Amino acid sequence: MRACLAGAAWVIALSAGTGVAAELEPAGQFVWRAPGEDFGGLSDLAVGDAGAGLLALSDRGSIFRARISRAADGGQITEIEVTATMRPEDNFGEPVSGFRQDAEDMAVGPDGRLYVAFESYARITGFDLPDMTAHPTHGWERFRPLWGNEGFEALTTLADGGLAAVIENPDGGAYRTFLWQGGTDWDE
């Protein structure tokens, strides 16, 4: 299984003062291969440590921590080495599997927890790294009407420290968005 990380190598520039996006120029391509059945189906990437660290979220329910090596000039990726494979727990304290493993997006909260949005069994859970202790952000039934393969698709940290989650398909032309400011429920 392999995943292309060409997206991580793109440079985005805006034309000075015009507000018009310039053409994207690829800086290079790297084909990432890793052993194991859990690798692949990557839904989200988070690059940190000044470009030397990576968290990758798989829709198969695994989170990969990796180290990125680059060419001497600091640009082109030369190697990505998985240093840890983590398996989140579901609401019952069991490793995610089947219907409960469809992870779509992640965001690091101001509390340092990694928050993961799941699509099929729609939920958002915070996890302590590296032990993956689960901290549900809502009750078991909160998002039951969204269960299936059209649940959460995007998750981000807001400037005020809260989280925003967006549903995959529009409802009446608008994308349902949920906001969380801590606690045990989400506002729509």
Model-based region annotation:
Residues 6-15:
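Bacterial N-terminal signal peptides
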